[in-house]
């Protein structure tokens, strides 16, 4: 799977079409790309995210002890293993976005000093983990969004339901939903499914939305949770929320802010005559 094939080519074409508003092309390429890559259906398989043999992975890179770039990849977002960073925690409100019965709910655990851990990424015992580049879940989400934006709501829920069913959920109820409501729910599903994989900021830019962060209310902040500790014990803590809920200048999050853009380093600008 480390060598791109026809599925990967379609997998690259699909988000390109989505970005440029070619809805039909995006849906066709995404559905073609996903063929043959079965979705994960249990939390045990979902928790780890470090094995190239995962049926959902379309493109990835195997890592070994002698050929590993160590701490620069997904598996170091592990919040359980002492050798990982243990600092990439979920928004305390993120868990509220999941429906009862969703296998991904099993990945949440209150831990450390009151942080909500999301055990999606795990490092292997030998301190490595295969690197995921593309998987079929993203393809189903691209197809669903593209079809919804094209106005084919009945067709859009088909790939959405393929993903929902694999995650332990019933079919999406389209009754009474508008096009915008369906698109919003598909984008919400992208947040649930692709958390931690690097899609957040690009989706914010692509859809011209704002970062969504809420501070804990007084009532929420006063709650107590039994938080797992790395020695296997539990301690009671109040929950910890976001440290930053506004831009660096203190203003609220808004769409299309320059704060969302990554600046090209000055050294690169000076060294590259093509810029």
Q: What residues fall within each predicted segment?
A:
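Mobile gating loops/cap/lid regions near enzyme active sites that modulate substrate access
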Residues: 79-80
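Acidic/polar-rich alpha-helix caps and helix-coil junctions
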Residues: 1-73, 85-86, 92-275
């Amino acid at each position: 799977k480390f060598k791109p094939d026809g599925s990967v080519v379609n997998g690259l074409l699909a988000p390109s079409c989505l970005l440029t508003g070619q809805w039909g092309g995006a849906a066709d390429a995404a559905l073609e790309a996903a063929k043959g890559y079965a979705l994960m259906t249990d939390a045990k398989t979902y928790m780890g995210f470090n094995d190239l043999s995962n049926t959902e992975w379309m493109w990835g890179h195997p890592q070994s002890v002698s050929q590993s770039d160590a701490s620069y990849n997904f598996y170091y977002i592990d919040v359980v293993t002492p050798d990982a960073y243990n600092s990439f925690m979920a928004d305390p409100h993120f868990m509220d976005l999941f429906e009862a019965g969703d296998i991904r709910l099993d990945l949440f655990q209150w831990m450390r000093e009151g942080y909500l851990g999301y055990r999606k990424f795990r490092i292997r015992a030998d301190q490595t983990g295969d690197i995921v580049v593309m998987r079929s879940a993203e393809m189903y989400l691209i197809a669903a969004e593209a079809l919804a934006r094209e106005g084919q709501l009945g067709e859009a829920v088909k790939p959405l339901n393929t993903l929902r069913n694999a995650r332990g959920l019933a079919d999406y109820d389209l009754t009474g939903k508008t096009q915008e409501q369906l698109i919003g729910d598909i984008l919400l599903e992208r947040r649930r499914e692709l958390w931690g994989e690097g899609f957040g900021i690009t989706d914010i830019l692509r859809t011209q939305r704002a970062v969504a962060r809420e501070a804990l209310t007084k009532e929420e902040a006063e709650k107590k949770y039994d938080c797992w500790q790395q020695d296997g014990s539990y301690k009671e803590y109040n929950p910890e929320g976001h440290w930053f809920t506004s831009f660096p200048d203190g203003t609220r999050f808004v769409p299309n802010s320059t704060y969302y853009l990554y600046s090209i380093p000055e050294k690169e600008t000076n060294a590259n005559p093509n810029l």
